[in-house]
Regions:
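N-terminal membrane-sensor/transducer module of prokaryotic signaling receptors
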Residues: 1-155
């Protein structure tokens, strides 16, 4: 076999390995469309079942968790009503919560919910609960009464 042919096969194998690894990682992460769908499902659940039952389901149930997607449910004062990944955050006032670059994550989400009713925040950094690493993230938020639900995607 020609040495240049062997090198081309080797390089092709390396490229294929990286592509498959990237596809596997993408499959482990929720998409923007999936985040929006989960948020809309959460808003419908709140309207059908009330905020208390919804908060319990978002925090402790399984129907609003999918890979790295989960619900954050906060009032417009920044109080965490439910959190699908970290129940210790429930009841905490998080209005002043900043990412490592100084971005006020909750304030950004409240601004989108109040001014647009629904939409995406700008990117910020947050610890991914599945990888335990700090990653870029954006959150889709949707207003429900004087609160909002949010579902973020890691990038």
């Amino acid at each position: 076999m020609n040495p240049s042919h062997i090198i081309k096969l080797f390089i092709g194998g390396v490229v294929a390995t990286f592509l498959m690894a990237g596809a596997a990682q993408a499959a482990d992460q929720g998409s923007a469309a999936e985040a929006e769908a989960m948020a809309k499902k959460a808003v419908a659940f709140i309207k059908a079942n009330g905020p208390e039952k919804a908060a319990e389901e978002f925090t402790n149930g399984k129907s609003f968790k999918d890979r790295d997607l989960y619900i954050s449910y906060l009032d417009f004062n920044g109080k965490m009503l439910a959190h699908g990944s970290n129940p210790k955050l429930v009841g905490k006032e998080l209005m002043e919560l900043k990412d490592p670059e100084g971005k006020f994550m909750v304030k950004m989400a409240i601004d989108v919910a109040k001014t647009k009713g629904k939409g995406w925040t700008e990117d910020y950094k947050f610890k991914n609960p599945t990888t335990e690493k700090l990653q870029e993230k954006a959150m889709y938020v949707e207003r429900v009464g004087d609160a909002y639900v949010g579902v973020g995607i890691y990038k």
